[in-house]
Amino acid sequence: MRLFKGIIGLVFIFLAIIFVYDIRFAIIFVSSYIFHELWHLILIKSFHFKVEEIHLIPFGGQIKMNCKKNHSPLIDAFIYLAGPLGNAILLVLSFIIKSDNLKMINLILFLFNLMPIMPLDGFYILVNFLALKLPYFYALKICLIISIVFASGLLILAPFINYCFLILAGYMLFISLNEFISSNFYKGLLLERIVDESNNNPNKEIKPTIRLKKMLY
């Protein structure tokens, strides 16, 4: 297992926050960021999934795991929900110790991560709840459309809120559109393969399945 790949990205965040705010604010932000990812890790380990690497990037952390067998989307939803829950715990703590910086940072992280925009936790929470009733592909497609709408709205509002959100919104809109286009391309290839196999083996029953072995949180 390779732990904490991408430390340079985390250092970049730390230095950028020091430049804009101060070192105390930067320490609280990075600590809250790591605490958020730690709660994802705790839930993943509690379900006995194997963690391959933890990758810290400027736009959020990624925990790569290997699933030996399929599992309920509800488990994935709980794992994605664990990160914002960690921020909620720190938010409660901020009221106890009366820390305005801790309160503001974790309130923003809590609300921001629950937005249904890819690659935020809120997006994958919604995908997995919909996947309880719909095929995963269609749940993903619906959520990508929602993600594009929300990211576009955030991009429009960002200049009136904070210019940092302008960069984030642009990034999230880009990956949402890219994933939407890629998923259409993937489905086309899958259907083409199914048609080819059915033509070559007209008497064979074809059951296309997708087994997800590696997930990112």
Language-model region placement:
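Hydrophobic transmembrane alpha-helices and their immediate loop junctions
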Residues: M1-Y217
